[in-house]
Amino acid sequence: MVGYRLKNTVSDNGTVSRGVCQLDSGSLRKVKETLKIKKYPDGRITDTENPAQEVPLDPESVVSMNFWGLPLDFEEMRPIHHLPPELAPEEQKAECLLPVLVDRLITAGRLDVAVLHTDAVWFGVTYQEDRPVVEQALKALHENGTYPPSLKG
């Protein structure tokens, strides 16, 4: 799994979901899918799932952005591969929280996950207001040669 710094993965425009990780000697020991992480203008980052009692989060915490290297034949993934095609409308928009499954397997002793660290800044469009920031970041990556002039091949 690629581990990002929490501070490098949050939006200025609203809450995000991240798998907050606990590590031991470079291995993932626990991952908690945290659904309402909020960054404040002063740099504080909190878990706001319970608004009456926000929980401070360490900006340097390692989080999962769902970059997992799992074998294609990984038997434990079968429930995800075999979702019924006739899902109800509310289920069609449901999110499959892979960190929840991974955490269960780690806890049961059926999975070991090495963590590769990155200091890269994650950017994505979670909110419409994120779009200009992402466009500028992509433009900068093209201009500095990180990305080729065209990604079309």
Model-flagged regions — what are they?
Residues 31, 77-78, 134:
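Residues that scaffold the ATP/ADP-binding catalytic core of kinase and kinase-like folds
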Residues 49-56, 103-118:
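Glycine-rich loop/turn
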Residues 64-78:
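Conserved nucleotide-sugar donor-binding
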